[in-house]
Amino acid sequence: MTVKKAYGAITRFFRAYSLPESSEYTLISDNLYLIKQRIGGVRTKNDKAEKLRLERCLRREGYVFSTESLISFYTSHGWTLKTAEVYRLSDNICTLLVCAVAEECDRFMKNGRGSTLRMRSAIESLRRLPELEINEVFSALCPTETLFMKVKGFADGDDATRDVYREALIRCARRRREDECVLLSRMT
């Protein structure tokens, strides 16, 4: 389900649900602006493998998101992320959480029942999404980060400086069609 379709399902539920005093309706009405705000900044790319990994992680945690649970899930499976994938991480998580809310809205409209807990957990995770510690994710899941720490300007720099280094690596690796780790190890 795309973000646009998910938001459409949520708004249809909001407009058509016949029990405005129900907890599900109140939950959606209280958080509709938050959902729309999170969707507005999402730039999606069709990376199905990465979305499947994230969905497994979110399902395991009961759609309660935290940076620590994400890192522990990925490290337990031995998965790593490229630099660009870490930057897209919050957008992919947002997409999956909004789709989870939309699926529950569809269930409520079709069957008259669904998982209020899943809906509530996904919305709370959407609230906490800006708290995603990108630097922690980089240091734990991105192998290029350890190579970058050897570079003098990167290790001493602030977040903006580190982002400049990371974005330059992404562009250079795409241009040369090489792996980021191989390219960075040759450059340092």
Annotated model-derived regions:
Residues T2-T188:
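Basic, amphipathic N-terminal segments
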